[in-house]
Amino acid sequence: LAQLRDACALVQHVSRLVHQLQKERGLSNLYLASAAAQGAGALSDQAQAVNGSVATVRAALEAQSLNLSGGHGARLFSAIAYLLQGLDALPALRERVHAQALPVDQSTAAFVRLIAACLAVVFEAADSACDPDISRLLVAMFHFMQGKEIAGQERAAGAAAFGSGLSDVARQHHWLHLIELQDGCVQVFAEFAPASPEMRGWEDVEQNPAMAVIERLRRVACTAREGERLDAALGERWFAACTQRLDAMHRVEGHLADELVQLCERKLAIACSVLASQQVLLREEEEKEKENEKEEGEKEAEAGSVHST
């Protein structure tokens, strides 16, 4: 349980890093698709925000890697190692984005791989949970994070579409697929999430005014004919509306992570209390056994003395 508590704390840090990386991915797409006409200043600021989260996660990963054991521990260690490789490659990716030296699709794919490495750490932490209550909450959180990641991919796809100023049928199909995948993740989340304010918080996200903007811009982009002009100025409006939604989702995610750590702490406290009680009972049994042995010894000595007399 102590290992699981530490793993859940790691999930908190990884969740924050994913949120920052998702935003950098979207801004990178806006920057590349608009030929650096949009998003340059925000992208630079966002890189600094990501760097702060990376430093926190590196410290947490280093601490976590020292306390891994067993088969689940080996898989979590492998996921951590893969994530660290991805983080090491991030500066080179940024240089290519800044120099506009790679297509939007390649930039998106690189960020998707890095975020997938983050989610793999969360998945392995969830897979290592032996307590059913903790496991259930971890499954709910993993699917919520996965749904949020797909929503982040939709933000990036829309930023690229509007930034380019042209409709593309292949991108439209991919866009609609992302919407469908989000719905699937939310269904699993709803199945495993506890009846709590976090669940109601998700319902509030879907009723946020930003969703009306997102729905309208989805229709604009996904119903346009192949090669039809899209208003490039809508790119920043799309990005802002999606960011409002993703920020709200991140708050729900944060509540889930806090509840997860608190649940681990409660379970650990109960386990420690039970263990302490068992140790007290064991000591009492040992003391009784010693007293019985002493009494038996005294009786034997007394019997021997009588026999000699």
Regions found by a protein language model. Name each.
Residues L1-T309:
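Hydrophobic alpha-helical segments
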